Amino acid sequence: MGWFNKIFKGSNQRLRVGNNKHNHNVYYDNYPTASHDDEPSAADTDADNDEPHHTQEPSTSEDNTSNDQENEDIDRAIALSLLEENQEQTSISGKYSMPVDEDEQLARALQESMVVGNSPRHKSGSTYDNGNAYGAGDLYGNGHMYGGGNVYANGDIYYPRPITFQMDFRICAGCNMEIGHGRFLNCLNSLWHPECFRCYGCSQPISEYEFSTSGNYPFHKACYRERYHPKCDVCSHFIPTNHAGLIEYRAHPFWVQKYCPSHEHDATPRCCSCERMEPRNTRYVELNDGRKLCLECLDSAVMDTMQCQPLYLQIQNFYEGLNMKVEQEVPLLLVERQALNEAREGEKNGHYHMPETRGLCLSEEQTVSTVRKRSKHGTGKWAGNITEPYKLTRQCEVTAILILFGLPRLLTGSILAHEMMHAWMRLKGFRTLSQDVEEGICQVMAHKWLDAELAAGSTNSNAASSSSSSQGLKKGPRSQYERKLGEFFKHQIESDASPVYGDGFRAGRLAVHKYGLRKTLEHIQMTGRFPV
């Protein structure tokens, strides 16, 4: 059947298609539509005579020569008849068939005559194969007349052997119906009616030369891009490809916020608390020191010194619950960024600080400017704070704890728990420690407080150890975002890559897990190192 395949494939129209992962080939195949109105051929005219049909018995050996000559004449007549019939079908099929040259037509006719001429001969009305009578007027395949039941030469009837082509039994993968004559698609290892090959996204037929796939589902390229091509969470545009043709984007390691690399250099603001970038359709609140705060973080932000006092009392109770009560009264002040930086410069004990300082435990006498009262914020901008000077006097080893204003409650609390540990160790007479040990154990305490807060929030208890209330500090169960924010602050502590805060925390956490907090602190006080 290779020769037939060559003829049929000669009329294929190939459309090469593909997506960003694979190229898919679609074939539009055109086959002649069967004609039921073919005019009779010369052999048909002979068969329509009024003379009665005579059935001849098989010839003897003496008649072989004459019979061979007659058979050759018959074969030639059949070939011419099939050639004329093929030309009639080609003209009727119109747009569904591709023109072929005369040599190809003659080759097709000769091939068919060879098949017909070599078919077995039977007497009129005899049965063939499964008891089906093949004779004048019999239908063959798809209800089309095959050979027209014509009688050739001396009344002998030629019953053609059924020739089954796989293409006659094509099943559409879309509707599971048979694909008859005409145009069809071959793609995704299946055959389709053109109207059945549809986009999985919009359910409309795919008629373009290229398409995309996800799994075994086809998509228009535009539909695939809309569904699967990543969009920037900042500008809401499709993330562009780089010079190598690959989609390149940035993503926050915790929030998985995807954004174009260009936003890292185009002054797109970040929230100073959660570090998420500001989307184009969202307005962050700008504090008077230039920091930006997203609306979710603003919802629980601690804005002035008075508002922070209940939280301070709660953390004091947290330490007392660990048998680590801070005996002296240490002032807590919320300050702006400039005041915090100035106080850090005035501190002489040489503590290590991060580039963005958000808390400070002071041991020197100085005057700082504290946020006494918060101001209402206008549209997208903080109106300002009412500040007043505060004179720090040295009554003990610790003069004050300073915290940056405008941070969410959980972040403010974790910073306060960190600075409280500095104060506790100084008041307990700990020796001067290496930076990684001191900052590491302070980070352990901040992490422990966050753990306790999130656990208390899961039992619908907010600040379980504090009965005080304050404007802006809400009671009741935490919102889903606030719990997520608390997990983010824990993640920041755990994933810190700095050798002082990050490595120090991991070493201190391991020691506390192995020996307990009390024994770890005793070992630090005696040796200045974490127990191993």
Curated annotation (Swiss-Prot):
Q: Which UniProt keywords apply?
A: Developmental protein, Isopeptide bond, LIM domain, Metal-binding, Repeat, Ubl conjugation, Zinc
Checking Gene3D superfamilies in the record gives:
Cysteine Rich Protein
- Transmembrane stretches in the record are none
Q: Does the keyword Zinc apply?
A: yes
Q: Which PROSITE patterns does this UniProt record tie to the protein?
A: LIM_DOMAIN_1 (PS00478), LIM_DOMAIN_2 (PS50023), UIM (PS50330), ZINC_PROTEASE (PS00142)
Q: Name one GO molecular function term.
A: metal ion binding
Q: Changing residue 362 to F does what?
A: In sod1-1; suppression of large seed and organ phenotypes of da1-1
Tell me, using the record's free text, what induces this protein: Induced by abscisic acid (ABA).
Name a Pfam family for this protein. Answer: DA1-like
Ranges for region Disordered? 26-71
What outcome follows a substitution of residue 109 to G? Abolishes binding of ubiquitin
What happens without the gene?
No visible phenotype.
- Here the cross-link named Glycyl lysine isopeptide (Lys-Gly) (interchain with G-Cter in ubiquitin) sits at 95, 221, 348, 376, 381, 391, 474-475, 519
Q: Where is the composition biased (Polar residues)?
A: 57-68
Reported effect, residue 113 to G: Abolishes binding of ubiquitin
Q: How does it assemble?
A: Interacts with ubiquitin. Interacts (via C-terminus) with DA2. Interacts with BB. Interacts with UBP15. Interacts with TCP14 and TCP15.
What role is this protein assigned?
Answer: Ubiquitin receptor that limits final seed and organ size by restricting the period of cell proliferation. May act maternally to control seed mass. Acts synergistically with DA2 to regulate seed size. Functions synergistically with DA2 to restrict cell proliferation in the maternal integuments of ovules and developing seeds. Functions antagonistically in a common pathway with UBP15 to regulate seed size. Associates physically with UBP15 and modulates the stability of UBP15, which promote cell proliferation in the integuments of ovules and developing seeds.
Q: What else is known?
A: 'Da' means 'large' in Chinese. Plants overexpressing DA1 exhibit early senescence.
Q: What is this protein called?
A: Protein DA1
Q: Which organism is it from?
A: Arabidopsis thaliana
